[in-house]
Amino acid sequence: MMVCGLGLAIQSCNDGKTYAELKEEERDAIQRFIELNEIKVIDEEQFEAQDSTTNVSANEYVLFDESGIYMQVIERGNGEALEDGRHEMLVRYLEKQIGEDGTTDTLSLNTIPNMFAHPDEFILTKQENSLSASFAASGAMYQAHSSTYVPSGWLLPLNYLRVGREISGRSKIKLILPHSQG
């Protein structure tokens, strides 16, 4: 009786897609999104040669090969590069999911001032090249995901931005994140 039950459980697990197949579908969906939106992908070497900026008018995004993150720097900011230590960060965001056909659906946002008077806040700790952060348990990201976890894909850009407090000097980016980074 026990062997039969185990056999049925193993057999039923084969009906779904493997993790590798799901990752491949995600890569394909991201590629379709890039094609649909006529995004020009540059490598990290070119990004660094351009002083860690992207050409927004050419719709450039840099691909960070190790993480699979794509980033477009719209406004780098006029603050300073982050020093080691603890930093209070304020963020407004629009989170979308890329579907199999490369189109998007909005999942979460805090960009509408009359709905979200305050940006989300997270506390960032930087120690040498290591970044970690957690959201305050009161913002839109916490409400959407019931977690204070700041996605690792949100941290990578902080190595290239000049974060400041003035609205006129804000940093603004667009990211395309694989599920493992977002």
Give the location of each predicted region.
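C-terminal motif of bacterial Sec signal peptides marking the signal peptidase cleavage site
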Residues: 8-12
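Cross-family detector of peptidyl-prolyl cis-trans isomerase
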Residues: 13-182
